[in-house]
Amino acid sequence: SVAVAGAVIEGASLTFNVLQ
C-alpha cells in the first residue's frame, strides 16, 4: 500500500542520514 511504501522510504532516508 501507499502507507507501507512511505514507511520504507522514511526508513531508507533515516538510514542514509545516519550513514552520512
UniProtKB/Swiss-Prot annotation:
Q: What is known of its domains?
A: Composed of a long N-terminal alpha-helix and a core region rich in beta-sheet structures. Before the pore formation, the alpha-helix binds the lipid membrane, partitions into the lipid-water interface and stabilizes the monomeric molecule on the membrane. Finally, it traverses the bilayer, thus forming the transmembrane pore.
- Which segments of the protein form a coiled coil according to its record? none
Function according to Swiss-Prot or TrEMBL: Pore-forming protein that forms cations-selective hydrophilic pores of around 1 nm and causes cardiac stimulation and cytolysis. Pore formation is a multi-step process that involves specific recognition of membrane sphingomyelin (but neither cholesterol nor phosphatidylcholine) using aromatic rich region and adjacent phosphocholine (POC) binding site, firm binding to the membrane (mainly driven by hydrophobic interactions) accompanied by the transfer of the N-terminal region to the lipid-water interface and finally pore formation after oligomerization of monomers.
Does the record carry Nucleotide-binding as a key word? no
| GO MF annotations, alphabetized | toxin activity
UniProt lineage: Eukaryota, Metazoa, Cnidaria, Anthozoa, Hexacorallia
Instruction: From the UniProt record, give one GO term of the biological process aspect.
Output: killing of cells of another organism
Task: Specify where the region named Plays an important role in the hemolytic activity lies, as residue ranges.
Answer: 3-12
Protein name from the UniProt record: Equinatoxin-1
